[in-house]
């Protein structure tokens, strides 16, 4: 017996309403569970201090409203972003962990060891092998993307053997419970000192050498070099690998006392996982045991992490000397060495948030200049005073007696509150910047009597090659006794010229 057409439509409509309602309900439940805050409280199923009792990697279609383990789904906490990212747009994958509601040391069964064996993928889809027992002490798992990524955070380590493969290599990393979780941004700010003090015990050491690296533009998977020069070097030129090779050679050649990274470590708009890119960018300094400080650029926070989150990761990495700061921006701090120097790092931020009032780039703000004035009052008797920026001031390109090349117009904020005038009044005679990749000159401003210096871009992931530009880095040698700064550059190409000191000049401060 055939149902009347009206009954069929009514039946389908009821089913459609039920399906839509179920879809929305599952979506709401999934979203609510994923927004539960994982805290660093002392204990509990959503505490970073409670050992993990199980781990799962869950895959689903992009349109699926519910993408988590089904059994006891309310107990699982998501600990990764979508691991497929843009590689496979119709699929999603997440790492989940489960912690016991009641943890009894020595009795509760936990995850004791995790390793990845791609040979076992057929038996276990992702090759993840887990050993359980009552001695488990893993409190956190993370994922990093890319074949050349490394885990640098203090106390963290990669799980053994192999990568998980989800359209790209995924490195699974772990934190044992004996390593405390990273404090929140607010807690880090509360603990911060007003400056970072660098001490040099060698009494015979007369000079301090600083390597300035700017605009490295790291991503996740290795991409072809952008604008390589000379053009014959383009074949098989992979951006991140070539940048790292250049940085390693500079560290070997110069043996700097510390490294200043003046912005755009990450090519945020092409980096699917900023944490992985950031660790890759600073790994050479950890390998060579060279302290470093990061001044963020306008590209660093264009990916999936904010400046605050990037600063939080840096706080966990050995050798990182930066601070978050308590004024506008992230990363306003002083590097100070008694009787030697005071280096003032200012966050020039990125694109403006109010394009009508201030189109283009954001500006240094009045509270930053007030902070700078207060810090100069603390350290004004140090022989060498320097300011560090990413985005230059317009006065950089009003300088005279240039040593180096002026290849592109300056990119600067049109809303700057006259920072150059403040530098003059505070008697800071030298300011350095990045951002303009193919400008690499030092010059003196005729009105302010301040030296402004560009580093030039060092990374192959950002633009370059204009006017025959070869990637390079700048070196500063500070002589506190003579109150002098000697500076030069090192070129990446040709190999036989890498040991040549280009455009050597001495700046009396």
Curated annotation (Swiss-Prot):
Lineage: Eukaryota, Fungi, Dikarya, Ascomycota, Taphrinomycotina
GO biological process: endoplasmic reticulum unfolded protein response
Protein name: Uncharacterized protein C1020.05
Keyword Endoplasmic reticulum annotated: yes
Main location: endoplasmic reticulum
Keywords carried by this UniProt record: Endoplasmic reticulum, Signal
Signal sequence coordinates: 1-32
PANTHER family: PHOSPHATASE DCR2-RELATED, PHOSPHATASE DCR2-RELATED-RELATED
Species of provenance: Schizosaccharomyces pombe (strain 972 / ATCC 24843)
InterPro entries cross-referenced by the UniProt entry: Calcineurin-like_PHP_ApaH (IPR004843), Metallo-depent_PP-like (IPR029052)
GO CC field: endoplasmic reticulum
Top-level division of the source organism's lineage: Eukaryota
Subcellular location: Endoplasmic reticulum
Gene Ontology molecular function, alphabetical: phosphoprotein phosphatase activity
